[in-house]
Design a protein with these regions (language model features):
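Bilobed "Venus flytrap"/periplasmic-binding protein-like clamshell domains
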Residues: 98-111, 143-146, 162-219, 234, ...
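Periplasmic-binding protein-like
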Residues: 159-167, 247-284, 303-318
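Ligand-binding clefts/hinges and TM-proximal coupling segments of bilobed small-molecule sensing domains
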Residues: 50-67, 195-214, 285-318
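A ligand-binding cleft/hinge motif common to bilobed small-molecule-binding domains
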Residues: 143-150, 198-199, 228-262
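Extended ligand-binding regions for polar small-molecule ligands
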Residues: 24, 41-61, 111, 184, ...
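Bacterial lipoprotein signal-peptidase II cleavage site
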Residues: 20-40
Length: 318
């Protein structure tokens, strides 16, 4: 995102209305539980949260043949995700099991690739890409595709998601999404929204207004708590996250303003692993072509985010 786009955001000239995804309340996932699961497999314990049944998805032999031997022998596709970002990735009702459409997508990719399972381990968001190729095979964790990230990893597009503001019910702090200057806004560390907020703040100062006080956190759930509690004016996050949270937050949080800055998100893979990249790209395209990706997203009310082409390192506008 450029400064000119930041200025347009403040004026809402760049606003684009998109459908809002909504499912269950992610505020039941507390930050201490999310943190404590780091480095442990959270995808096998029982939970009552809805998930997509991937058992009907077949193995595609031509794609399975592309999977690197190390991954084949292990039999699992290891995903790293920040499990506090519903509906994409979050902990289920048992506070241990990773749930969400990204978790199910990883399992679906594993099925197509002829593997036994796709497992998801919680990791704090900024640590995922550096761990690709060692701790994790893939990072499916709402990674907005940017030129900077494409320098760090291969990214395969699969959904298109915008950004939105969330405020405490009734907007008691009178937050104006068209003029966030001088406000305190919570963002998740390392996200596209953190970058956007910083550029918005720079534009505020350039326009002679007060800067935005940007409060980054590793866990989106911590931010939501502070917004509801009145410590922050707003949170700025993926539109699917805001929609999911506000719709079933018990009336404690609401979206304000339009959805802006729609951008593709991608599966991250180690930049040097061309073989796995090719296998995952073809597996994702298979899920798209056969309706599985859209069905998975529909389980979480996010079917409108589905893309139809699994593009490797697509051009970015930032």
């Amino acid at each position: 995102m450029t400064i000119s786009k930041a200025h347009a955001l403040i004026a809402l000239a760049a606003a684009a209305a998109l459908p809002l995804a909504a499912c269950a309340d992610p505020t039941s996932t507390n930050s201490s539980t999310s943190s404590s699961t780091s480095g442990t497999d959270t995808s096998t314990a029982a939970a009552t949260t809805t998930s997509y049944d991937v058992s009907k998805i077949p193995t595609v032999d031509d794609i399975a043949a592309l999977v690197p031997d190390e991954v084949k022998q292990r039999g699992t596709l290891r995903n790293g995700a920040s499990a506090d970002y519903a509906p994409a990735e979050f902990l289920g009702d048992d506070s241990q099991t990773a749930q969400g459409y990204d978790v199910d997508i990883n399992k679906a990719l594993a099925k197509v690739m002829g593997l036994n399972d796709g497992t998801t381990n919680h990791a704090e968001f900024p640590t995922i890409i550096p761990a690709l190729g060692t701790k994790f095979d893939v990072g499916i964790s709402s990674f907005t595709i940017t030129s900077e990230r494409e320098e760090q990893a291969n990214l395969i597009s699969y959904v298109q998601v915008g950004s939105a503001y969330g405020v405490a019910a009734g907007n008691p702090k009178n937050f104006d999404p068209t003029d966030p200057c001088g406000k305190t806004i919570g963002v998740q560390t390392g996200t596209a929204q953190e970058d956007y907020a910083n550029e918005l703040s720079e534009q505020c100062v350039a326009d002679g207004k007060d800067k935005i006080t940007i409060m980054p956190h590793d866990l989106q759930t911590d931010i939501t708590t502070k917004v509801i509690g009145g410590q922050y004016d707003a949170t700025f996050a993926d539109s699917t996250v805001i929609g999911y949270t506000t719709n079933l937050s018990g009336g404690k949080l609401e979206q304000v303003g339009d959805i802006v800055e729609s951008a593709p998100q991608g599966v991250a893979i180690n930049k040097n692993d061309e073989q796995l990249t090719q296998a995952v790209q073809k597996a994702m395209q298979y899920l798209m072509d056969n309706g599985y990706l859209k069905d998975i997203l529909a389980t979480y009310g996010a079917q409108d985010a589905a893309l139809t082409t699994a593009e490797l390192n697509p051009a970015t506008n930032d």
